[in-house]
UniProtKB/Swiss-Prot annotation:
UniProt protein name: tRNA (guanine-N(1)-)-methyltransferase
Single GO biological process annotation from the record: tRNA N1-guanine methylation
Its biological purpose: Specifically methylates guanosine-37 in various tRNAs.
NCBIfam families attached to this UniProt entry: PRK00026.1, trmD
Subunit structure: Homodimer.
Family label: Belongs to the RNA methyltransferase TrmD family.
Location in or out of the cell: Cytoplasm
Catalysed conversion reaction: guanosine(37) in tRNA + S-adenosyl-L-methionine = N(1)-methylguanosine(37) in tRNA + S-adenosyl-L-homocysteine + H(+)
One Gene Ontology MF term: tRNA (guanine(37)-N1)-methyltransferase activity
The entry's keywords: Cytoplasm, Methyltransferase, S-adenosyl-L-methionine, Transferase, tRNA processing
GO cellular component, one term: cytosol
Region (Disordered): 219-246
Length: 246
């Protein structure tokens, strides 16, 4: 099954962009996924192909019009009714690895890329759109966010990564950051690879990696650590452990 990516955008020339090279590019050439950028202006009805207007209530910038976007969205929903419809916006829910896995397991995605000051809120009220954010910062438009989302999905498609399990231990897959990595040379600028990684003892190596993943997450991403600890406490084994400690 081909993972179908439809992107509603004012800049279709941005796609596939960087997704046309490396793993994603090879997967595109092999038909593992398809890229269909759709020009939003094609759904405008005036001779200027207008897609935006001044914000109600005043203020700076322009707002993307609900009527024009709705025609583009409806076209996408008719074309790919089984694909979830996402909108890249800083007002959306943070994109997580868990959500990426859900999307990658489906038939594809349709992504609406916002521009200017944002999208008329009535569009979200009238259409089944999932607002998604890739972080707490502002970009020039949703296209870069769409590329990020698609890359995260594409690399999880069957046959895209070299080893089938190469993504299983990456950051966020277990709710933690990934453990540190090392490779040759064994010594560099006076710094050596940790002895445990050169021991050949797989049980010790796994224990070290788990411990480092927990330590790094606790120090670098206390928000993730708190979430991880909360989930562990609610699990059956965690509940038994807490009861025993009491």
């Amino acid at each position: 099954m081909t993972f179908a990516a439809t992107i509603l955008t004012l800049y279709p020339e941005m796609f596939p962009g960087p997704l046309g090279v490396s793993l994603a590019g090879r997967a595109l050439a092999e038909g593992k996924w398809s890229c269909d950028p759709v020009q939003i202006r094609d759904f405008a009805t005036d001779r200027h192909r207008s897609v935006d207007d001044t914000p109600a209530g005043g203020g700076a910038g322009m707002v993307m019009r609900a009527d024009v976007l709705a025609r583009a969205v409806d076209h996408a929903l008719e074309t790919r009714p089984d694909s979830p419809l996402l909108a890249m916006t800083p007002r959306g829910a943070p994109l997580t690895q868990a959500r990426v896995r859900q999307l990658a397991a489906g038939p594809g995605v349709t992504i609406l890329c916002g521009r200017f000051e944002g999208i008329d809120e009535r569009l979200f009220e009238a259409r089944p759109i999932e607002p998604v954010s890739i972080g707490d910062y502002i970009l020039s438009g949703g296209e870069m966010g769409a590329l990020v989302l698609l890359d995260a999905c594409i690399r999880l498609l069957p046959g895209v990564m070299g080893a089938p399990d190469s993504g299983d231990e990456e950051s966020f897959e277990s709710g933690l950051l990934e453990y540190p990595h090392y490779t040759r040379p064994a010594e560099w600028e006076g710094r050596t690879i940790p002895e445990v990684l050169r021991s050949g003892d797989h049980a010790r190596i796994e224990a070290w990696r788990n411990a480092m993943a927990e330590t790094d997450t606790r120090l670098r991403r206390p928000d993730l650590w708190e979430r991880h600890e909360g989930a562990r406490a609610q699990s059956p084994s965690g509940a038994r452990r807490q009861k025993k400690e009491r």
